[in-house]
């Protein structure tokens, strides 16, 4: 003879977060105010007989179960518990307002990186000056022992005079010039290296422009025809 099992999908309640001193009778006593109870049991450890901190309560009807689950975090035996229908599973506790926030995960590659810039593009503070934008550094041009190009004040000094002369003759793509530091000469023609990040002093630029004042556009045109 087969027995018909009652459907408890909407009447069986899971109760979690119970204190260890909660018993079947104390659990039943709490839920009696919501309606008739068919069963109330606290799950215990088989070896020690102590409560595992959760239990199940089966209400007589669905309406009673809904009333019992209206408060998802009731205080049972002095401790905040969590209540939900058993078929839905355990419901997480509601955290206090002061702690109801999550910590954003930080990518390991951005840890200990100033401004979140990858390591290859992080420049030492000695190279970053107010108003100066350092261009993109190619990896092939970087030093073998460091990802940064050694731009020092001494390295800038040798290009200051060349930068002033190049600025004075920007309109001539190929200008004849004597052997000057910072210029590369080949086949009688010279071209200026790219201007450095720091501009030359006004006095230096004026002196360089005066030194090349003797070259007239006609002479430069003749030099290009050679």
From Swiss-Prot:
Keywords: Cytoplasm, Differentiation, mRNA processing, mRNA splicing, Nucleus, RNA-binding, Translation regulation. The keyword Cytoplasm applies. Its main location: nucleus. GO terms for biological process: 3'-UTR-mediated mRNA destabilization; cell differentiation; DNA damage response; mRNA destabilization; mRNA processing; mRNA stabilization; negative regulation of cytoplasmic translation; positive regulation of 3'-UTR-mediated mRNA stabilization. InterPro entries: Nucleotide-bd_a/b_plait_sf, RBD_domain_sf, RNA-binding_reg, RRM_dom. GO terms for molecular function: mRNA 3'-UTR AU-rich region binding; mRNA 3'-UTR binding; mRNA CDS binding; pre-mRNA intronic binding; sequence-specific mRNA binding. Coiled coil: none annotated. Residues 11-88 form the RRM domain. It comes from the Eukaryota. The keyword Nucleotide-binding does not apply. The RRM domain is necessary for mRNA stability and mRNA translation regulation. Multifunctional RNA-binding protein involved in the regulation of pre-mRNA splicing, mRNA stability and mRNA translation important for cell fate decision and differentiation. Plays a major role in pre-mRNA alternative splicing regulation. Mediates preferentially muscle-specific exon inclusion in numerous mRNAs important for striated cardiac and skeletal muscle cell differentiation. Binds to intronic splicing enhancer (ISE) composed of stretches of GU-rich motifs localized in flanking intron of exon that will be included by alternative splicing. This is RNA-binding protein 24. It comes from Xenopus tropicalis (Western clawed frog). The gene is rbm24.
């Amino acid at each position: 003879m087969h027995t018909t099992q009652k459907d408890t999908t909407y009447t069986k309640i899971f109760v979690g977060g119970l204190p260890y001193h909660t018993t079947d009778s104390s659990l039943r006593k709490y839920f009696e105010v919501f309606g008739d109870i068919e069963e109330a049991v606290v799950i215990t450890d088989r070896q020690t007989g102590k409560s595992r901190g959760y239990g199940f309560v089966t209400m007589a009807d669905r309406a009673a179960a809904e009333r019992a689950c209206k408060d998802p975090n009731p205080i049972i035996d002095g401790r905040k518990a969590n209540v939900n229908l058993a078929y839905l599973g355990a419901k997480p506790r509601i955290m206090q307002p002061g702690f109801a926030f999550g910590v954003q995960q930080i990518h390991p590659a951005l840890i200990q990186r100033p401004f979140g810039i990858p390591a290859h593009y992080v420049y030492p503070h000695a190279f970053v000056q107010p108003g100066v934008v350092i261009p993109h550094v190619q990896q092939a041009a970087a030093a073998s022992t460091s990802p940064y190009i050694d731009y020092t004040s001494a390295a800038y000094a040798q290009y200051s005079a060349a930068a002033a002369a190049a600025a004075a003759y920007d309109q001539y793509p190929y200008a004849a010039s004597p052997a000057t530091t910072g210029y590369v000469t080949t086949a009688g023609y010279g071209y200026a290296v790219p201007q450095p990040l720091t501009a030359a002093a006004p006095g230096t630029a004026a002196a360089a422009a005066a030194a090349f004042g003797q070259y007239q556009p006609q002479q430069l045109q003749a030099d290009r025809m050679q």
